[in-house]
A protein has these predicted regions:
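A short, basic/flexible loop-to-alpha-helix module at the beginning of a structural domain
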Residues: 1-12
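Beta1/beta-strand and adjacent pyrophosphate-binding region of the FAD-binding site
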Residues: 10-23
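Glycine-rich FAD pyrophosphate-binding loop
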Residues: 16, 32-55
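Conserved N-terminal/central alpha/beta ligand/cofactor-binding core
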Residues: 48-131, 139, 288
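Residue-level recognition of phosphate/Mg2+-coordinating polar/acidic sites
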Residues: 66-68, 86, 92-110, 171-175, ...
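Predominantly flavin-linked oxidoreductase catalytic cores and closely associated redox partners
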Residues: 120-121, 126-288
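A conserved FAD-binding loop/helix module that cradles the flavin
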Residues: 176-183, 367-394
Length: 395
């Protein structure tokens, strides 16, 4: 096995980044600007995981500019991210992408997208700015301490005989995705939280094809309000994704109770003033028509004047306290995972492992995951910047 020592630049450091995803590539871009010799390792196509983000439009960030308020959108990592976001905020993200040649706009829901509405375009802009970064299409098998640096053993993805290659680096940045294998770190005593699906649709015991595709706007679960989509397997959409993130480590089955119309409804008054209307026509002002029969059955077809107090209360209970039993997640839908390197192992001011000098961790490699809306990419950009700053300051 040939041992290749990467040439040190004027900075006195040469850096390996393992994982050519969002965080790894941006970290490489920032480090090359500082004059470092940077090598990216990934067995697949760089930035391939960026392509499906934001429905293919690439939701770069969220227009939340206070770092503490921004951090509230991460079920795992909120306090850890205070320091990170105070150093690299949403403002900094906009400036970064302007520098990369990516123009942006903010939607009414505060999500920030490229004006091209194309993740492919963003990918191309980032890669075009990595002119001085070497990209190795190799799978890293092992990292070992070697003198004052690190030895990386990797297998070329294109090699039929799987010949092992060895490299020497002064610094290593772990920026792999949450679905990746952490076995290459087995020589280091690091606590790693096994990945679980996050931001994923939920399979429920209660299923009905007749309501598949129905969306309830601004439904509420335990103080969280967002749109809820009913599907053939259960529930999906923004509210379901938030719940899946919060409850990523809960055991199945578990129950959820939804308020489908959080605003108070004076149903008795509506029944009294519309005595000859069917109940479904009265309720359709508050919830989608296609959901009413599923919730209350044949009561939907009864005239308002025939509804007694007990039936009225039953209707209200279905509107304000719909109970669903979650039995699993929708396999193959997840794009984000809960899990990764335990945050107790990381210095939040530098992204460096506390036990091992000159090894840094960023992005989804960390046990950090956020809600839908650009939050996970914000974590990728911000932690990449903090790692770059730490290496620059101490090199």
């Amino acid at each position: 096995m040939a041992l290749e020592s990467k040439t040190h630049t004027k900075t006195g450091a040469n850096i390996a980044i393992i994982g050519a995803g969002a965080s790894g590539c941006i970290c490489a871009y920032l480090l090359q600007k500082e004059g470092f010799d940077v090598t990216l390792f990934d067995k697949g196509m760089p930035l391939r995981t960026l392509l499906p983000t934001g429905g293919g439009r690439c939701n770069l960030a969220h227009a939340e500019y206070d770092f503490k308020d921004l951090a509230k959108n991460y079920p795992r990592g909120e306090k850890f991210l205070y320091s990170v976001f105070s150093k690299f905020s949403t403002y900094d993200t906009l400036a970064l992408f302007d520098e990369l040649g990516v123009e942006t706009y903010t939607q009414e829901d505060e999500r920030i997208f490229p004006t091209s509405n194309s993740a492919k375009d963003v990918r191309e802009k980032i890669l075009n700015n990595l002119k001085n970064v070497q990209i190795q299409k190799e799978e890293v098998i092992k990292i070992e301490k070697f003198d004052s640096g690190f030895k990386i053993l990797a297998t070329p993805n294109y090699s039929k005989n799987k010949k092992m290659c060895e490299y020497l680096f002064s610094h290593v940045i772990i920026a792999i995705g949450g679905h990746s294998n952490f076995d290459f770190l087995k020589n280091f005593e690091i606590k790693i939280i096994p990945p679980k699906p996050s931001l994923v649709g939920l399979n429920t015991k209660e299923k009905s094809k007749e309501i598949s595709g129905v969306v309830v706007k601004n439904a509420n679960y335990n103080g969280l309000t967002d749109n809820l989509l009913f599907t053939h397997f259960g529930i999906s959409g923004p509210l379901a994704y938030k719940i899946s993130s919060i409850k990523a480590r809960d055991n199945f089955p578990y129950k959820l109770n939804f308020d489908l119309h959080p605003q108070e409804i004076n149903l008795q008054e509506l029944l009294n003033t519309n005595p000859h209307k069917d109940v479904k026509n009265i309720l359709s002002k508050f919830i989608p028509h296609g959901l009413i029969k599923y919730l209350i059955g044949d009561i939907a077809d009864i005239k308002a004047h025939k509804i007694d107090g007990k039936t009225r209360d039953f209707i209200l209970s279905k509107l304000h306290n719909l109970e669903l039993t979650v039995i699993g997640t929708n396999k193959g839908e997840e794009t984000v995972t809960a899990g990764g390197i335990d945050l107790s192992e990381i210095n939040p001011k530098t992204m460096e492992l506390k036990k091992y000098q000159n090894i840094y961790c960023t992005g989804e490699a960390l046990n950090i995951d956020g809600f839908c809306g650009g939050y996970n990419l914000q974590n990728a950009w911000s932690t990449a910047f903090v790692a770059k700053e730490a290496i620059t300051d101490f090199s």
